[in-house]
């Protein structure tokens, strides 16, 4: 959200299933709108938010069949789907939908060294708010991993080896 805004995105939309995470996306990271998949129909919400145009750039951080299918449905004409990282099972992509929309797909896992330098510069300048927001002792690793798997961690957890 933050980087998209800094690069000139006029409207950013966070999509997810957890009210707390969507609230964080809006309040902390500047999402203009949110779609809660447990309460709203994705395509209807995106049409309402975008005035029927769809989304120019969809960043899919889940990358599974459901997320890729949903992402291609909400893409605008000539939009770009950016697959970030890898999911568990290979995702099936409907080429007809992409061709009809003249959309494209880009896969990435980290970014280039140049992009990493830009990101570090943005963080140093104070223009980015950190995602790491819960500090833990090393002996809490099992509890933190359990909470992470259960989707109970908002943002990112990190371990401080000097924390007693």
Predicted regions located by residue number:
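C-terminal hydrophobic helical "lid"/dimerization subdomain
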Residues: 69-70, 77, 113-164
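A generic alpha-to-beta junction signature in SAM-dependent methyltransferases
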Residues: 50, 62, 74-76
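Short amphipathic alpha-helix with an adjacent loop that forms part of the alpha/beta core around
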Residues: 41-52
